[in-house]
């Protein structure tokens, strides 16, 4: 069997053996998710917050939690956000809770009925909403989509975690969206809302400004660099997997240079 020649994986999510420690953060965030606690995770880009949340998601799913992910960086408009929420609700929630023919019934109460398409290659469903309808119709439709995770959690007696990546983008999509989201999310005790973002100043304004709808609505977790002692063991293990041990002096010099920054170290 061939062994890997590169000890590290970078430029993509660090999963399985590529994930670097952070067991304290994993345990804390997992506990919050299991208890329905809303959390905002602060970290600069390339600090591993997405990999951390994926690790927590895997463990939460193993404990029967339904986990749904939406990346707001891919939803520049309200219409696209509604489409993405519909896709996520179908793929991450309804697909687990219902048989195939029953899944689309989840969307029967929407103001705008979604247009459903099927990717001929993957079989994945896509959702779109008629952009020609009145803006208020789209707003009502999106609000109803935001309500669905909580409704499904209550009706099926399941815990749900809704992960919203790059959450600071919500303000650019529509300045009124934080009000709509907050009014819905505060009525969903069965749902743990996990907010991720890389623009700290924007997230701090959203969650720490008393004039904002999300003021003090979520526990705050900051992801920092990885302690050298923890990183050192990980580096040694990764090199050992390739059959090429690394000298301790080399590892020390690298960590002195990167100061434990995850991406820079790898």
What is the predicted function of each stretch?
Residues 1-39, 44, 99, 244:
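A short, basic N-terminal segment
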Residues 22, 50, 261:
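Short, conserved phosphate/pyrophosphate- and ester-handling motifs at nucleotide-, phospho-/glycolipid
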Residues 44-70:
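P-loop NTPase Walker A phosphate-binding motif
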Residues 62-84:
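AAA+/P-loop NTPase substrate/partner-engagement loops
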Residues 79-99, 113-124:
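Conserved NTP-binding/hydrolysis module of P-loop NTPases
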Residues 128-200, 208-210:
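Conserved Walker B catalytic segment
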Residues 205-256:
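Helix-loop-helix "sensor" segment of P-loop NTPases
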Residues 258-266:
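The conserved phosphate-sensing helix
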């Amino acid at each position: 069997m061939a062994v890997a020649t590169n000890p590290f994986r970078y430029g993509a999510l660090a999963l399985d053996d590529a994930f670097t420690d952070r067991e304290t953060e994993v345990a804390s965030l997992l506990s919050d998710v299991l208890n329905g606690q809303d959390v905002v995770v602060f970290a600069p880009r390339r600090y591993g917050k997405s990999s951390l949340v994926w690790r927590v998601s895997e463990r939460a799913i193993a404990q029967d939690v339904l986990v749904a992910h939406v990346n707001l960086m891919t939803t520049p408009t309200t219409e696209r956000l509604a489409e993405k929420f519909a896709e996520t609700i179908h793929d991450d929630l309804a697909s687990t809770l219902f048989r195939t023919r029953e899944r689309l019934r989840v969307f029967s109460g929407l103001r705008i009925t979604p247009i459903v398409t099927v990717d001929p290659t993957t079989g994945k469903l896509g959702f779109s909403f008629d952009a020609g309808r009145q803006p208020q119709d789209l707003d009502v439709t999106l609000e109803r989509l935001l309500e669905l995770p909580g409704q499904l959690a209550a009706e099926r007696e399941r815990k749900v975690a809704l992960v919203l990546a790059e959450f600071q983008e919500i303000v650019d999509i529509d300045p009124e969206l934080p009000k709509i989201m907050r009014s819905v999310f505060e009525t969903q005790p069965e749902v743990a809302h996990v907010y991720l973002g890389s623009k700290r100043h924007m997230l701090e304004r959203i969650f720490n400004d008393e004039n904002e709808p999300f003021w003090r609505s979520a526990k705050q977790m900051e992801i920092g660099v990885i302690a050298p002692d923890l990183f050192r063991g990980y580096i040694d293990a990764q090199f050992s997997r390739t059959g090429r041990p690394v000298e301790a002096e080399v590892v020390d010099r690298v960590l002195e240079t990167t100061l434990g920054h995850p991406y820079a170290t790898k």
